[in-house]
Regions:
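A short, Lys/Arg-rich alpha-helix, primarily the initiator
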Residues: 1-21
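Residue-level signal for the short linker/turn that defines the boundary of a DNA-recognition helix
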Residues: 12, 22-23, 49-52
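Alpha-helical residues within the helix-turn-helix
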Residues: 19, 30, 59
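Recognition helix of helix-turn-helix/homeodomain-like DNA-binding domains
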Residues: 32-48, 58
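Short amphipathic recognition helices of helix-turn-helix/homeodomain-type DNA-binding modules
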Residues: 52-55, 59-92
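Hydrophobic protein-protein interaction segments
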Residues: 90, 96-107, 113, 120-277
Length: 277
């Protein structure tokens, strides 16, 4: 890509993000402490940014790190933030830290999920939970359907699976809460096609109310979600939390989450202990 083409791509991306965030050039100039005139010149290609300026603007626009790297490359610069593979990331100190967290949380479920809520790793308590839900979670983190197809285990797709909804007490509360979270994340990452596809699939799943399509900004979700799991004679009650890593220099790590389950009654606590053996 030649210099002129790069300038056009960067200018278009900058203007897109500013519009997506609902900011005027003056708003952005104040947030980034840059003159509105310079913002205008950058968006028309009359000025070229430095890599430092790209990062300043990205931070002012609250652009995710993965997209900030894209913005830097569009301006002709190298990526700023590392994007290691999951295997590479979890084969080092982080993997050992996750294992320690898993061990300390036993016998209660805990799992690591990626930005699309695919299960990356789980402790033994998590494996038992999936077994109760009728999910065959192998060591490779895949699930086999009745047709024999193989794919990642996705906790949101399981939650919205019509065949498993009866297993979730107060399914509308749990599902609507997670859908609002996904809608917020999709707004924050508008270029994430896989995330948009997941959101579209869930919104259009059978039995999902039409009014869930439009997120209600007045609804404030609690930091913890209560969930009841039912399977045959088994009933388990948990509070679930989602923890994110604070990783300002690593895209992959910043997109990982730890989903933890805490029992809310003695019956659930004892059953988790018995299942782990």
């Amino acid at each position: 890509m030649n210099s002129a083409a790069r300038e056009r791509v960067f200018a278009a991306l900058l203007k897109y993000w500013r519009g997506h965030r609902g900011m005027s050039q003056l708003d952005l100039s104040l947030a980034a402490e840059v003159s509105a005139r310079h913002i205008s010149f950058l968006e028309t290609g009359r000025s070229n940014p430095s890599p430092e300026m790209v990062v300043v603007l990205a931070e002012a626009l609250d652009i995710p790190m993965r997209d900030t790297n894209e913005l830097l490359r569009a301006a002709g610069f190298a990526s700023r933030y590392a994007e290691p593979s999951l295997d590479e990331l979890l084969s080092g100190p982080l993997g050992m830290a996750v294992t320690t967290m898993f061990d300390h949380h036993e016998p209660f479920p805990m799992m690591v999920v990626d930005r699309l809520y695919n299960v990356v790793r789980t402790n033994q308590g998590g494996l038992r939970l999936f077994t109760i839900a009728g999910v065959d979670l192998g060591a490779s983190g895949t699930i086999a359907s009745e047709a024999g197809a193989i794919g990642p285990v996705n906790v949101l797709r399981l939650l919205f699976d019509p065949a498993r909804r009866d297993m979730i007490g107060d399914w509308p509360q749990a599902a609507s809460t997670m859908l609002r979270r996904l809608q917020r994340e999709a707004f924050h990452r508008p270029h994430d096609a896989a995330l948009a596809e997941l959101l579209d699939d869930l919104i259009n799943a059978p039995g999902v109310p039409a009014d869930w399509r439009q997120p209600d900004p007045t609804v404030r979700d609690e930091p913890m979600l209560g969930i009841e799991l039912r399977a045959g004679d088994i009933s388990m009650n948990f509070l679930t939390t989602i923890t994110e890593f604070n990783a300002p220099q690593n895209v992959t790590l910043a997109e990982l989450r730890i989903e933890s389950y805490f029992p809310t009654d003695d019956q659930t606590r004892e059953l988790c202990t018995q299942l782990l053996g």
